[in-house]
Design a protein with these regions (language model features):
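Catalytic/RNA-binding core of pseudouridine synthases
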Residues: 1-139
């Protein structure tokens, strides 16, 4: 199979414990290191579908990157860590949980468009480096 023979999309079910870029590199190896790119970045602690385009289809990535996305998540209440995720050191545990009404009223604030400020331990690039890499150096 030649590189220019490969064009199209796959939706990889990325497991927990691997970065989106590492997943892409593994898939590229299967397809003879052909040109490929993905839409969005899933945190290494996240699992989910990672859309990967190959060959000429990489030109269509821009159309998918602006589309609506849906996230399903699980919350562990009461644990505060140094990084805001499961990789950080647990700083404190609080055994007080929000009521179901409080949760319902809060999630209604997330319907519609809003600007989300990226967490300092996110994959967002800051001066060419991932924010979480810079933040971990300061710990």
């Amino acid at each position: 199979m030649k590189e220019n023979d490969i064009s199209g999309w796959i939706f990889l079910d990325k497991p927990i414990g691997i970065s989106s870029n590492r997943a892409l590199q593994k898939v590229r190896k299967i397809f003879n290191n052909c040109k490929a790119g993905y839409v969005g970045t899933l945190d290494p602690l996240a699992s989910g579908f990672l859309p990967i385009a190959f060959g000429k289809s990489t030109k269509t990535i821009k159309y998918l990157s602006d589309s609506c996305k849906e996230y399903v998540f699980e919350i562990t209440w009461g644990i505060h860590s140094s990084t805001g995720d499961l990789e950080g050191e647990v700083m404190k545990i609080i055994k007080k949980y929000p009521s179901l009404d409080k949760i319902r009223n809060t999630y209604l604030n997330f319907i519609g468009d809003y600007y989300q400020v990226p967490h300092k331990f996110s994959s967002k690039k800051v001066d060419g480096k991932k924010a979480y890499e810079l933040a971990r150096k300061k710990l």
